[in-house]
Amino acid sequence: LFERCGGCTLQYMDQPSLLAWKTGLVSHALEKAGFDIPQDITSFQVPPNSRRRADLAVRRTEQGIVIGLHAKGSQDVTDMTSCAVLHPAIVSSLPALRTTLRTLNAVHKTADLHINLLDSGLDILLSTDSPLIATDRQRLTALAEELDIPRISWQRLKAATPYETAVQRAPVYQTIAGHQLTPPPGAFLQATAQSETAIQQAVLDALPARLGKRASLIELYAGCGTLSLPLGDRCQVQAYEGYEPALAALKSVGKSRVTSVCRDLNRQPIMGKDLGKADVVVLDPPHAGAKLQMRQIALGKPDYVIYVSCNPAALSNDASQLAQAGYRLETVSVIDQFLWSPETEAVCRFKRESSRRSRNALSH
């Protein structure tokens, strides 16, 4: 399966060598951006069979339903019968999913399947190329009962209409930093529970040593609150997120030290004059990075920028704007949450050189 599936291109490497290679990727990206690399780079690697999030392709063939990832360099889908990366709870659900999807009128030729393993169990978002009819809903209900799935949601492929709930059997919940919330269907979560904790800790460790009561922190691309909620235990947080359902999940917690605003940062970035008022800016942008937003951060010149990256190439491009604006790279953490994939996570702290701004907020 490894030789055909396009998911794990580096499975021939042992895990220590893989982590060392990815640490080198991050270091090279930051050097290319114009920074000296700190001597002490912390690193963490998730164990196999721990990934709790899966985006899978579905194809109807003459033999039945195929569920898996695209084959290397192809649009063909490799049927996933085993996986060294995914959590066993996801892999073990695939046979029943194949059986049910084969009977659905909604799956004419193709579908997409997004599975999140939450504290409440599997949460499934099914996107199909044909409408969902009444008998399809009945079959999905039977599937949910068989696998004890709290919620199955559905939407049309490539349609502007939002998802709808097809089956709801029980409450859906996930605990983030000690706070229980309900993520929307298909919500972005860090790939594993272990890496979520590691990223949260790396960001908290990257905060200035003393954050006083007057310190202000702006968080960009907040999602459901993976970073907002633990940061809110340390200081006042102004969180921005462009996806309203994710922001609604964060708001539902009602954490008084976290205020949140819905804003598409790729189309309407926070301006430099506002960012410059913050003592710390934390951002966790999408895979493509945050070119326009980074330009405003460089103009605003907040004292500290903590950047969480899942793409070394985008990190290099974005960080180069900080290098040109006079920032120094102080700390780097590498988190390998994408085992045997070229992708890796990194948490970097940048400090503005020769800051003349008062740091009373950081010490009182």
Walk through the language-model features, giving the residues of each:
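A short glycine-rich, hydrophobically flanked beta-strand micro-motif that places a catalytic Asp/Glu
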Residues: 40, 108-117, 152-153
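Nucleotide donor/acceptor-binding cores
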Residues: 52, 122, 214-215
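Rossmann-like S-adenosyl-L-methionine
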Residues: 131-364
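Carbohydrate-binding surface patches
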Residues: 115-129
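Extended interfacial segments that mediate partner engagement and assembly in macromolecular machines
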Residues: 2-110
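A short interface-forming secondary-structure element
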Residues: 83, 125-134
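Short beta-strand micro-motifs enriched in acidic
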Residues: 57-61, 116-118, 351-353
